[in-house]
């Protein structure tokens, strides 16, 4: 089983762009967001720990993991 998925992170709600990334599928959303922000050197204060999966219409929150919601390569994850 692949431990990473290739997704697009959309930070346009925070005046940042979109980024194509390979991210770990097994981390809780709150840890994943922190990891991605740190890796991209993006500073967002009061970051929301909710992600909308634009390609599937799902909402993921703090303790949800990508692997549990069948998030796959090519999905678009928008930080709310």
Swiss-Prot record:
Keyword match Protease: no
SUPFAM superfamilies documented for this protein: Ubiquitin-like
Disruption phenotype: Deletion mutants display only a small defect in acute infection, but remarkably are unable to promote persistent abscesses during animal infection.
GO cellular component: cytoplasm
Compartments (UniProt record): Cytoplasm
Family: Belongs to the EsaB family.
Main function: Seems to regulate secreted factors that contribute to the establishment of persistent infections in the host. Negative regulator of EsxC. Not necessary for the production and secretion of EsxA or EsxB.
Protein name: Type VII secretion system accessory factor EsaB
Organism: Staphylococcus aureus (strain Newman)
Organism ancestry: Bacteria, Bacillati, Bacillota, Bacilli, Bacillales
């Amino acid at each position: 089983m692949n431990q990473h998925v290739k997704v697009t992170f959309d930070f346009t709600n925070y005046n940042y762009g979109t980024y194509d990334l390979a991210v770990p599928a097994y981390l809780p959303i709150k840890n994943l967001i922190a990891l991605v922000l740190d890796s991209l050197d993006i500073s967002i204060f009061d970051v929301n720990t909710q992600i909308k999966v634009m390609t599937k219409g799902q909402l993921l929150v703090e303790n949800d993991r990508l692997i549990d919601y069948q998030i796959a390569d090519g999905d678009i994850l928008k930080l709310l």
